[in-house]
């Protein structure tokens, strides 16, 4: 099993896709001898801010949603940068479902008062500052100063990760748009047979690379796969770092049957 960074807890939020992608990036760096712990709150904040302004620009027709797909995190990193966990985290657990409703009401208030986009963004940021915390403008690490984008590029380049999927209803060995409602950024992936996907996952793990897995009956959970194992009946599993905290029998890990994957 690969070494892992600290287990986090997404609470009741649907932000597993952020937790899982950042965990994958963190553990890729661990494999290179580099320790990095990234801020989920920062990426979640920027996505929520983006959703808020989309609601404003559509005059309230866009519903704010915290759901997404893990590869979207790569896009968010390239747009807004990144922060270390210690630089930006809430000292009290945040109910992001409540916060998203609060932001939605803030945008609706701005629309009702006919505020322009600049003032609306100020109002949204005020709420985010009050509920998550004020953001540093720079990242300081190891005696060096980085902009948020510089720091993001130091931990993840735009084309560093490859997106693969296995969908029977889609053309095989073709790059397709992932046909899920949570795909807000028109993310694409190479569609390959299921057995090929499993082999690629196994190969990556044996080479010391974590694998981001996103799946379920309705593409409804994302985790960072860190190893393989089997039980006393011979059933094979992928072992994953989950984002449901450590107060559970598996101490924050998730065991996924290979035939389920």
For the regions a protein language model found, what residue spans apply to each?
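Active-site nucleophile-adjacent alpha helix/oxyanion-hole segment immediately C-terminal to the catalytic cysteine
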Residues: 1-164, 205-207, 243-250
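Active-site signature of cysteine proteases
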Residues: 5, 122-261
